[in-house]
Amino acid sequence: MPVDFTGYWKMLVNENFEEYLRALDVNVALRKIANLLKPDKEIVQDGDHMIIRTLSTFRNYIMDFQVGKEFEEDLTGIDDRKCMTTVSWDGDKLQCVQKGEKEGRGWTQWIEGDELHLEMRVEGVVCKQVFKKVQ
């Protein structure tokens, strides 16, 4: 049985986020606003079905998917692109590949203790985020 990501997570670390957004061609005003936010993550997992809600005072983003099945992801509100996304298990980690206009786009997510780690990648730029489980 894979690890269970279910829970409510508060952001502790947001390293290199503005550079990540720049690599996605997000305009400077939105980058500055987004860099000030400390979004929470609410994750509901039922086997290989996952709903990941990224919640902030500025904008919310919901990702609803089945692990191992490719789907079209609408990134309106992030960088206004669509991509074909596949999330797969790699041991106890979730690996995401987002195929679209930007090369090398995706993320890896895993748990260490009571912390959720998220590494987002695009065109060689890496953003590292850490969240603490609060419930």
From Swiss-Prot:
GO MF terms, alphabetically ordered: all-trans-retinol binding; fatty acid binding; retinal binding; retinoid binding
GO cellular component: cytosol; lipid droplet; nucleoplasm; nucleus
Subcellular localization, as worded in the UniProt entry: Cytoplasm; Lipid droplet
Effect seen on changing R22A: No effect on retinol binding. Abolishes interaction with STA6 and the ability to enhance STA6-mediated vitamin A uptake
Record region (Important for interaction with STRA6): 22-32
Expressed in which tissues: Detected in nearly all the tissues with higher expression in adult ovary, pancreas, pituitary gland and adrenal gland, and fetal liver.
Stored Pfam families: Lipocalin
Primary localisation category: cytoplasm
Keyword line: Cytoplasm, Lipid droplet, Methylation, Retinol-binding, Transport, Vitamin A
Family per similarity comment: Belongs to the calycin superfamily. Fatty-acid binding protein (FABP) family.
Domain remarks in the Swiss-Prot or TrEMBL record: Forms a beta-barrel structure that accommodates hydrophobic ligands in its interior.
Subunit: Interacts (only as retinol-free apoprotein) with STRA6.
Role according to the record: Cytoplasmic retinol-binding protein. Accepts retinol from the transport protein STRA6, and thereby contributes to retinol uptake, storage and retinoid homeostasis.
Name used for this protein in its record: Retinol-binding protein 1
Species for this entry: Homo sapiens (Human)
